[in-house]
């Protein structure tokens, strides 16, 4: 039976001393849910898994319920197939990630049903500091490192729409 590779992005773990989960425990949690070849990456909740299941909605429900029960917090995840991730990388705007000495780059992954078009309505950019671009499945955000403290990206964290987003940085060429 063919297996599918997925990237699972957890929201709000190991941030600000809340929802602390060791990566070995997180890996064991995914394995207990029946996923194979589980690999965690850094402490912010990036997990690669394999599954024979192709129903993303069912997988999201399974993962959120399983993690919520095992780790006693309301788990929220963004699930991205290998094909979708390749599309997100390919759809990045020209030059995105090309000058990591001058700019900080972030990809804002969206939890369905939030669309990039709708998410962009909540994203403010500060002229001369920030740039934002809506792709097909994610938002791409860059800001000048020298002026990062005046960036508007942090404003999104206080908005209700942020509950359906997760931001990952270091997305470079």
What residues fall within each predicted segment?
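Surface-exposed, charge/polar-rich loops and edge strands
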Residues: 2-44, 48-173
């Amino acid at each position: 039976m063919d297996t599918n590779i997925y990237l699972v992005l957890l929201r709000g773990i190991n941030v600000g001393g809340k929802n602390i989960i060791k990566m070995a425990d997180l890996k064991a949690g995914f394995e207990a849910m029946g996923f194979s070849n589980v690999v965690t990456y850094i402490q912010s909740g990036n997990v690669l898994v394999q599954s024979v299941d192709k129903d993303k909605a069912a997988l999201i429900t399974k993962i959120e319920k399983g993690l919520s029960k095992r780790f006693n917090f309301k788990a929220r995840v963004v699930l991205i197939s290998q094909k979708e991730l390749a599309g997100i990388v390919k759809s990045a705007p020209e030059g995105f990630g090309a000058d990591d000495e001058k700019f900080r780059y972030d990809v804002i992954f969206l939890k369905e049903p939030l669309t990039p078009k709708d998410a962009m309505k909540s994203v403010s950019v500060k002229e001369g500091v920030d740039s934002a671009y809506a792709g097909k499945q994610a938002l791409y955000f860059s800001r000048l490192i020298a002026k990062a403290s005046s960036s508007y990206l942090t404003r999104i964290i206080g908005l209700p729409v942020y509950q359906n987003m997760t931001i990952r940085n270091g997305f470079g060429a």
